[in-house]
């Protein structure tokens, strides 16, 4: 029987293509709709577990065209979205794939442009992202209908003398908000340092990054240390 405690009101004004559950019970919904229960929400919305609108998920003007076909929530709470859209998301140009923060704001650290529909997104056990659809190109690289992407799917910050999300691992992005000395060989996805912050890699130690160092701070590689 239909669960009458799921309070969606008038529901959606057009097709729902995807429903994705978050670990906290909230519900991400993507499709071709422009409204949910009388509230303007273009192509994507997040609901509370009881079906009511989650107003903390702020998408602004949403998608200007196309549809949302697939949604994946990363371990760090960021959300990958794919579909047929090729206009803008809240005023910023996007083509078939983007990533938003847990609050719905566009994540400018991620960029992927596809020349055709993105139909499905999945994550492997080693945190690589596999995408499939009707595309032949991913950000200028020829890939026919399927591709695998490398990206950082988790983050830990060094602040107030501690890591905010556990010690560094190969799948995590490191963000330093205070001076720090890396005294043991450390593997990470990438590394960013805040302005005015200095991070030292001690002699005999390696900082091994999947991607790169970035940020406005200073990374010091001592004699006998290495970065790769």
Describe the role of every protein-language-model region.
Residues 1-153:
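Extracytoplasmic mature domains of secreted or surface-exposed proteins
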Residues 152-228:
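Extracellular beta-sheet-rich ligand-binding/adhesion modules
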């Amino acid at each position: 029987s239909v669960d009458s405690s799921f309070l969606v009101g008038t529901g959606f004004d057009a097709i729902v293509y995807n429903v994705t559950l978050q670990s906290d019970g909230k519900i991400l919904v993507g499709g071709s709709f422009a409204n949910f229960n009388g509230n303007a929400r273009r192509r994507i919305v997040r609901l509370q577990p009881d079906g009511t609108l989650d107003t903390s998920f702020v998408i602004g003007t949403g998608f200007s065209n196309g549809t949302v076909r697939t949604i994946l929530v990363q371990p760090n709470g960021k959300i990958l979205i794919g579909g047929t859209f090729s206009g803008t998301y809240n005023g910023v140009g996007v083509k078939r794939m983007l990533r938003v923060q847990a609050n719905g704001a566009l994540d400018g650290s991620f960029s992927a442009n596809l020349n055709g529909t993105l139909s499905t997104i999945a994550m492997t056990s080693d945190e690589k992202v596999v995408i499939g659809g009707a595309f032949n190109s991913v950000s200028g690289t020829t890939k026919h209908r399927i591709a695998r992407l490398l990206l950082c799917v988790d983050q830990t910050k060094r602040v107030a003398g501690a890591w905010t999300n556990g010690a560094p691992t190969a799948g995590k992005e490191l963000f330093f908000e205070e001076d720090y000395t890396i005294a043991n060989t450390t593997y990470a996805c990438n590394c960013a340092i805040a302005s005015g912050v200095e991070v030292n890699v001690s002699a005999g130690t390696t900082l091994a990054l999947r991607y790169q160092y970035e940020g406005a701070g200073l990374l010091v590689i001592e004699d006998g240390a290495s970065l790769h």
